[in-house]
Each structure stands twice: as structure tokens, then as C-alpha cells.
């Protein structure tokens, strides 16, 4: 049995400190050579996620990127990822390639239906990106919220551009948000 934890946004401020995960379990289904490989689908559940055929009525999200190892040690998920599934290493009786091991890793997931919290302004997703809105959560930290005001908290700032260094932000910038990636500084201004 493989154990998976799902998260729908990074906890912590500045655009991504770490995942807020909910542990869940799953059993390999045998649909692909690798458990939850790119373009395979998962079901949703309150206690488990399973690999299912993407044409199944149980399919809820598609894998858009898949990496071995821990999130903190690996590449960032694509910008419009809706949530991340964390896969714990297991040694089940049957697995994806017959070697007796499902390695630790993570799958970057995109929901099959709207809403997409990973879209710019969507109010969630594991990464803060250009077009997202944030609010102050205290102690110099910010959290993402929906730009349309439908989130738990109203938006205070919108990330309007991403740059390499703060000095490259427009003069109208009032808040700098840590984004990660090749342009790690988000330039934000009041909504």
C-alpha cells in the first residue's frame, strides 16, 4: 500500500514555504508502468487517493508532472498546478513495475473540472504566481486568496510581475512576494 498526502496550497507566507498536507493512502492500480505517472489520473477521497483511468467517472485530477524524492529537494511543480500529492515509499506485494517498491515522490495535479485554484487569481495552488492575490497573515507573511473576493479573506495585494531582483520591480510596487523559480521576486501592489 502506498501512502499519499494531498495539499491544495502551500502553508506559510511569502508564496511557498511548504505543503499543508493531509495524509491519505492508496493502492497501486496497475494502470501504468509508474504509479501516478504523467497524464494518469487519480480519484478524490477524504481518506485515500487511487489511480484510476482518466475516462472513469471517479477521475478527479490529472498528473501534470511527477518527481521522485521530496518536494523540498526536487523541482517546482508547474505554475498552474492545483495541488500536490506526496507519495510515501512503500513495498507492496504488487507495484507498478514488479520490483516491490513504490519510491517516495510527488505528483503535481490539475483538477479535471473547474475551479482551478492554481490558475492566476484562483486563490490556491501550491505556488504563488503572477496574477495571484495575497493578504497579510501577520509576522511579515502573506497567504494567497482569490482575487474575486470569494476566498476566506479579501485580497489586499495583487502580484503584477515577477523579476530576478527587487530593484527590477515597478515603482508602484508596495509588497515583495517570494515566488521561487527563475524570477523569484513577485512585485505586488494594492488591489
Predicted regions and their residues:
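Primary mode marks residue(s) on the alpha4-beta5-alpha5 output face of response regulator receiver
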Residues: 8-191
Amino acid at each position: 500500500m502506498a501512502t499519499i498526502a494531498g495539499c491544495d496550497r502551500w502553508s506559510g507566507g511569502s508564496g511557498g514555504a511548504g505543503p499543508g498536507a493531509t495524509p491519505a493512502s492508496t493502492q497501486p492500480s496497475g494502470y501504468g508502468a509508474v504509479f501516478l505517472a504523467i497524464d494518469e489520473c487519480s480519484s478524490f477521497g477524504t481518506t485515500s487517493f487511487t489511480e484510476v483511468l482518466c475516462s472513469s467517472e471517479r477521475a478527479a485530477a490529472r498528473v501534470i508532472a511527477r518527481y521522485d524524492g521530496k518536494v523540498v529537494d526536487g523541482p517546482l511543480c508547474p505554475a498552474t498546478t492545483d495541488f500536490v500529492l506526496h507519495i510515501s515509499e512503500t513495498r507492496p506485494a504488487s507495484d507498478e513495475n514488479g520490483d516491490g517498491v513504490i519510491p517516495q515522490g510527488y505528483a503535481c495535479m490539475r483538477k479535471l473540472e473547474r475551479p482551478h485554484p492554481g490558475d492566476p487569481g484562483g486563490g490556491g495552488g501550491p505556488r504563488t504566481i503572477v496574477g495571484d492575490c495575497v493578504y497579510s497573515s501577520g509576522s511579515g507573511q502573506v497567504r494567497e486568496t482569490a482575487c474575486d473576493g470569494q476566498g476566506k479573506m479579501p485580497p489586499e495585494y495583487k502580484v503584477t510581475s515577477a523579476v530576478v531582483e527587487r530593484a527590477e520591480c515597478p515603482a508602484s510596487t508596495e509588497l515583495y512576494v517570494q515566488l521561487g523559480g527563475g524570477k523569484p521576486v513577485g512585485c505586488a501592489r494594492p488591489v
